[in-house]
């Protein structure tokens, strides 16, 4: 797909089909996302794929609002920034996440950026508790 077409087609989707994402497709999307540029070529971003429905359901409940729709996604990619690699780890993670969204679109997958850095945890957590830096990108 042409890049301009990817830009036109890219949108946030919050309802997903229940069919699993093929491993080969996931591997391609991840490989393409990890080719994204990073500060000083530090590659300080790590991607973790979750396909276990119980784990995805727990991830969906990590926040009081704004992430419940994750529960029905067949796959979730956690975008994690390594704060020891560079002071620009957040920026690197955002660049990689954006590349991941575009790669998913190119592969015919739906996705949605769910940002949780510094967002409140569940109500039963201690006051001031926050979710550590992580982006959740459900894919289908």
What are these regions (language model features)?
Residues 1-140:
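Acidic, surface-exposed loops and disordered segments
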